[in-house]
């Protein structure tokens, strides 16, 4: 699928794509890489070692595929440089801790967009920017209420849209 997306961008058939590697609610089992159960059932692992290993394999596979996509974008010239530099790609999950459906501290990666002002080379943990935050070791509570209530996922999406030239407030 990533090859088709690159081709669509390269030929200017579209400038926007949304692609899910699997439904957030189920996500397929991938027996070829040793993932025997769907992502949803694995996310409710309750600390089960086998489930956690399969979840890790699934995550690793998906990140490798995303890396492949970025590499392909970096090798295509769009006339002004690498296609990756004029593309913003977001990878991540709508849950930070699937065992309890935690929706804060989302694990997200923003890639590309160097040519439109996206700065890279850092890890941004919005919780660490909050006075009094003393780490994630305080248990599951951090996944249910954000430490930094001003760090909204919608702000990231808004910034991405604005960088791509969409006029929105």
Which residues does each predicted region cover?
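Ligand-binding pockets and gating/stacking loops
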Residues: 1-169
């Amino acid at each position: 699928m990533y090859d088709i997306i690159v081709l669509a961008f390269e030929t200017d058939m579209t400038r926007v794509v949304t692609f899910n590697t699997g439904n957030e609610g189920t996500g397929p089992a991938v027996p070829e890489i040793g993932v025997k159960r769907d992502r949803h059932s694995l996310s409710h692992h309750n600390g089960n070692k086998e489930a956690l290993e399969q979840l890790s394999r699934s995550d690793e596979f998906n990140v490798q595929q995303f890396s492949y996509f970025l590499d392909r974008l970096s090798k295509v010239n769009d006339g002004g440089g690498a296609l990756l530099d004029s593309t913003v790609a977001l990878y991540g999950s709508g849950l930070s801790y699937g065992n309890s459906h935690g929706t804060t501290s989302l694990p997200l990666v923003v890639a590309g967009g160097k040519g439109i002002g996206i700065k890279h080379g850092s890890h941004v943990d919005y919780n660490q920017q909050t006075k009094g935050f003393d780490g994630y070791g305080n248990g599951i509570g951090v996944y249910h209420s954000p430490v930094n209530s001003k760090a909204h996922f919608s702000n990231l999406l808004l910034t991405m849209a604005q960088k791509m030239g969409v006029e929105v407030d």
